[in-house]
């Protein structure tokens, strides 16, 4: 399978962030840094990309995020929004992206099948969406999750600019 270039993946979102002088930070999990890599691949990324972290394990989450509310489960819309809001607040950005899921080839410890992910964007507008690719292909899922997160950022950044 072939994948788009990293800059092409984030191009629409990056163009909107640059045009609107807005910033973004990322807390990602099953994408393993692919969302951040796509944003940084755009020339001039330092104008809009502030930073991020890979929250791959509970230990990583404890190090990078505030304590999550009791009863909040990973790989849910609630948790993805928690990631997005937390990283946005921690980094002082206009937008925050949160991503959590199961890239494959098997499910995650929370009972989600491979290909399940939740991406969220928090900022002037916020939304979380659930993805279900139905595939166990780890790399293909990582690209699909990253594309969904960056497409959601572009959609919300465009809406907020109106």
What are these model-predicted stretches?
Residues 1-162:
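Short alpha-helical segments enriched in small residues
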């Amino acid at each position: 399978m072939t994948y788009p270039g990293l800059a092409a993946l984030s191009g629409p979102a990056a163009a909107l962030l640059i045009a609107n002088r807005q910033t973004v930070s990322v807390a990602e999990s099953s994408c393993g840094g692919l969302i951040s890599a796509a944003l940084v691949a755009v020339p001039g990324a330092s104008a809009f990309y502030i930073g991020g972290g890979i929250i791959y394990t509970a230990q990583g989450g404890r190090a990078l995020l505030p304590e999550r509310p009791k009863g909040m489960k990973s790989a849910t819309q609630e948790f993805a929004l928690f990631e997005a809001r937390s990283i946005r607040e921690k980094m002082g950005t206009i937008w925050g992206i949160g991503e959590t899921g199961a890239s494959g080839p098997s499910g995650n410890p929370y009972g989600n099948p491979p290909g399940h992910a939740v991406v969220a964007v928090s900022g002037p507008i916020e939304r979380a969406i659930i993805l279900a690719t139905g595939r166990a292909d780890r790399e293909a899922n990582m690209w699909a999750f990253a594309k969904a997160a960056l497409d959601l950022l572009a959609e919300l950044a465009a809406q907020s600019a109106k």
